[in-house]
A protein has these predicted regions:
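Short active-site-proximal "capping" loops at secondary-structure junctions
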Residues: 39-41, 59-60
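FMN-binding flavodoxin-like domain, especially the glycine-rich phosphate-binding loop
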Residues: 3, 13-16, 24-33, 47-179
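Aromatic-flanked redox-active Cys/Sec active sites in thiol-based oxidoreductases
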Residues: 7-11
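Short loop/edge segments at beta-strand edges and connector loops
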Residues: 36
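Short amphipathic alpha-helix with an adjacent loop that forms part of the alpha/beta core around
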Residues: 41-47
């Protein structure tokens, strides 16, 4: 099984999750390409992969701008190539997990849901079966927002994602790849 682990991380929270995903995939003996989206040109053909993990932090209820731009480019590329078809028929042996890290200071997980749904649409349009949507709490790291890590709706989220969160991610990865 060929696995792609594609992510954007501005503060390091999503990168922690992405690295744990990569480790767990490798422990299962699968090949994995882990790629950080940076906003620079990234040549990737998602259709070369049987299983894709795609993640981002949540910024104003959406994935990071570099990931949004990449997904727009990919959607356009696949439309032109005729890979996006009416009714989005499922591709055999094509699976995806979309995930995010979020602080949820104002409305909790509801702030993160639009970001994950947005990311999932690329894969759904390409006929991938979306196996799961993962939401991992992550602390606010910028000086301006750091206070939200203790005063937000989710309570004290300092230090998250922590080792317990990352162990949970690894267990989920191992469960997903046993398809």
């Amino acid at each position: 099984m060929k696995v792609l682990n594609l992510y954007f991380s501005a503060t390091g929270n999503t990168e922690k999750v992405a690295m744990r995903i990569s480790e767990a995939v490798q422990e299962l003996g699968c090949e994995v390409d882990t790629l950080k989206v940076t906003g620079k040109d990234l040549e990737i053909d998602i259709l070369n992969y049987n299983f894709v993990f795609a993640g981002s932090g949540v910024y104003a209820q959406l994935p990071g701008t570099p990931l949004i731009e990449l997904f727009k480019e990919l959607m356009q590329k696949y439309r032109k190539a005729g890979e996006v078809k009416p009714t989005s028929p499922r591709r055999p042996s094509a699976y995806a997990v979309v995930y995010c890290t979020y602080g949820g200071a104002h409305t909790g997980i509801n702030e993160a849901i639009p970001a994950v749904k947005y990311m999932g649409q690329l894969f759904d349009h390409l006929g991938y079966t979306i196996m799961a949507e993962w939401y991992t709490v992550g602390e606010y790291k910028t000086e301006k927002l750091r206070g939200h890590s203790v005063a937000g709706r989710l309570g004290d989220i300092r230090g998250r994602p922590n080792e317990e969160d990352l162990r949970d991610i690894a267990a989920r990865v191992k469960g997903m790849l046993q398809i």
